[in-house]
Design a protein with these regions (language model features):
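Glycine-biased low-complexity/repetitive sequence motifs
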Residues: 1-184
Length: 184
C-alpha cells in the first residue's frame, strides 16, 4: 500500500502503508520492473479438479502482491442426488492475496442449508499491511449457493437463503475493493 503524506495532491487507499523502512519503497526517476497481475484462467472439462485457477501476482520493484485465490467448484447432482465422481463434493477455494469463494454442494451427504467450511484464506502469504481478505463459505443447497471472493477492504460473504428454490438460494457477494487516485 502507498503511504499518503498530508501535503500530497492525491487520494490514497484507506489501507495506508508503512511510512518507514523496511516496508517502504522510495522511488526515484528511473526504471522499475512492474508486472500487472491477471485474473485466473478458466478451467473446463474434463479436468479432474474444477477449482478455479488463482490470479497471477502483481509486482512493483521489490514488492510482490499475491493474486487472488481461485473459487471452489460446485459438487453434487441435480435435486439433491449426488452425481458420479468427481462431482460428489464441493471443493475448497484456494488461498491468495484475497481468498476465493467456497463452492456449493447439492448432496445428501451434508444437511441441507448447512454452511460449508470451504472458503479460501486471504493475505496468503501473510504480510502487513494485509493484501486482502478471506472468501465466503459455500452452502449445501439446491441452487448453487457459492461464497463470494474476498476483497481488499472486506471479506467475501457466505452463501445465504433457504436453498430449496432459486430466488431464496443466494450466493455470497464479493468483498469490497479500495480506490486510489494519483494525478499530477
Amino acid at each position: 500500500r502507498e503511504v499518503k503524506s498530508t501535503v500530497t495532491p492525491y487520494t490514497a487507499s484507506p489501507l495506508d502503508g508503512y511510512p518507514s523502512a523496511p516496508n517502504r519503497v522510495t522511488v526515484t526517476a528511473t526504471s522499475y520492473p512492474i508486472t500487472v497481475g491477471a485474473g485466473g484462467a478458466p478451467k473446463s472439462p474434463p479436468s479432474p479438479n474444477f477449482t478455479g485457477n488463482s490470479g497471477s501476482n502483481s509486482v512493483f520493484s521489490t514488492v510482490t502482491s499475491a493474486g487472488g485465490g481461485g473459487g471452489g467448484m460446485y459438487g453434487g447432482g441435480l435435486a439433491g442426488v449426488p452425481a458420479p465422481a468427481p462431482f460428489v463434493t464441493a471443493s475448497t477455494a484456494l488461498n491468495g492475496g484475497s481468498g476465493g469463494g467456497g463452492g456449493s454442494l447439492c448432496s445428501g451427504s451434508a444437511p441441507l442449508n448447512e454452511l460449508l467450511s470451504n472458503k479460501g484464506t486471504g493475505n496468503t502469504p501473510p504480510v502487513s499491511p494485509s493484501q486482502g481478505n478471506n472468501g465466503g463459505n459455500g452452502k449445501n443447497a439446491y441452487y448453487y449457493s457459492a461464497g463470494g471472493g474476498g476483497g481488499a477492504s472486506s471479506g467475501g460473504a457466505d452463501a445465504s437463503g433457504a436453498g430449496t428454490t432459486a430466488p431464496t438460494s443466494i450466493g455470497g457477494a464479493g468483498g469490497n475493493g479500495v480506490a486510489t487516485s494519483i494525478t499530477g
